[in-house]
């Protein structure tokens, strides 16, 4: 417990919050080849590898993950949501923030239905999250 005199001299230090998606906080100036502070809701990147990972202890599955090199030069792991995907090496993808709780080190999601990523086929509910188009009415 500090004394009043210590508080008058130094004061309290505000705790700085850490970002949950730090790769989205950095930009890149290609002319000056310098990284800049530029927050963005999504970022574009190129897949360097696509693989499956097993989750942490109580869960069991093969989760689909892509390693993505972003336009700011940072390389991150991003989860591929939905059933089935068409991604491979050199696919151009859009990533957003959002971690996968049972995959350590995976802090980003790939946005389905944009750039080279196809939407989920035969998806009827929650279509907007998976980039699926509205099905034609059968009459």
Curated annotation (Swiss-Prot):
Residue numbers spanned by region Disordered: 1-21
PROSITE patterns given in the database record: RIBOSOMAL_S12
Residue numbers of 3-methylthioaspartic acid PTMs: 102
Gene Ontology biological process terms in this record: translation
GO molecular function: rRNA binding; structural constituent of ribosome; tRNA binding
GO CC annotations on file: small ribosomal subunit
One of the Pfam families matching this protein, by short name: Ribosom_S12_S23
Record's keyword terms, sorted: Methylation, Ribonucleoprotein, Ribosomal protein, RNA-binding, rRNA-binding, tRNA-binding
Function comment: With S4 and S5 plays an important role in translational accuracy.
Entry's family note: Belongs to the universal ribosomal protein uS12 family.
Alphabetized PANTHER family for the sequence: 30S RIBOSOMAL PROTEIN S12 FAMILY MEMBER
Subunit structure: Part of the 30S ribosomal subunit. Contacts proteins S8 and S17. May interact with IF1 in the 30S initiation complex.
Protein name: Small ribosomal subunit protein uS12
Organism of origin: Alkaliphilus metalliredigens (strain QYMF)
């Amino acid at each position: 417990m500090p004394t009043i005199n210590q508080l008058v001299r130094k004061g309290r230090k505000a705790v700085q919050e850490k970002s949950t998606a730090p790769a989205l906080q950095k930009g890149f100036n290609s002319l000056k080849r310098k990284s800049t502070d530029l927050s963005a809701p999504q970022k574009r990147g190129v897949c360097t590898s696509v693989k499956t990972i097993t989750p942490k202890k109580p869960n069991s599955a093969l989760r689909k993950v892509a390693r993505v090199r972003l336009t700011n030069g940072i390389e991150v792991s991003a989860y591929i949501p939905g059933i089935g995907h068409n991604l491979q090496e050199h696919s151009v993808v859009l990533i957003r923030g959002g971690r996968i709780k049972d995959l350590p080190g995976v802090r980003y999601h790939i946005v389905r239905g944009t750039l080279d990523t196809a939407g989920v086929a035969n998806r009827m509910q929650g279509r907007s999250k998976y980039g699926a188009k509205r099905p034609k009415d059968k009459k």
